[in-house]
């Protein structure tokens, strides 16, 4: 979990070239559409909605451990005493769960990581670039505390 919080891979869009779906499909293949209990152990995941009864909030990052019926999710959660603990949950208990090998830049707002990699699907001087794209790129760059890798289509 600590390594997950130290590294972010960001995409500007959910769909399209170099998008969140593109990255997940390339790395996970058909497993992305399967039951989360079939996802590989070690896969980063993100909670897609608030579940206060479990101590989870929309955007909380976790990781899969185990496989099949033994599959579980680990999430960092705040304890009643204000400390941070680790919660181990069965995947069926999470209403909205997605792989999180990469995140959209929008989803990563408010997050920071030591190392950030940004996948950018067009040249920075592209005529298709707009003010919205520049703001998105700025947001992505400012997520990095120590290092930034910017991968751009030539």
Residue ranges and their predicted role:
Residues 1-63:
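Conserved helicase/translocase motor-coupling segment
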Residues 60-154:
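C-terminal accessory regions
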């Amino acid at each position: 979990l600590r390594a997950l919080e130290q590294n972010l891979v960001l995409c500007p869009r959910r769909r399209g070239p170099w998008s969140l779906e593109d990255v997940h499909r390339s790395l996970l293949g058909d497993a992305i559409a399967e039951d989360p209990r079939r996802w590989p152990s070690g896969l980063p995941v993100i909670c897609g909605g608030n579940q206060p009864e479990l101590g989870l909030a929309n955007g909380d990052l976790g990781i899969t451990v185990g496989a099949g019926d033994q599959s579980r999710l680990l999430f960092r959660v705040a304890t009643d005493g204000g400390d941070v603990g680790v919660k181990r949950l069965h995947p069926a208990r999470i209403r909205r769960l997605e792989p999180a090998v990469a995140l959209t830049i929008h989803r990563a707002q408010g997050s920071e990581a030591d190392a950030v990699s940004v996948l950018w699907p067009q040249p920075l001087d592209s005529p298709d670039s707009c003010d919205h794209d520049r703001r998105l790129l700025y947001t992505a760059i400012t997520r990095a505390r120590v290092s930034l890798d910017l991968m751009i289509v030539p």
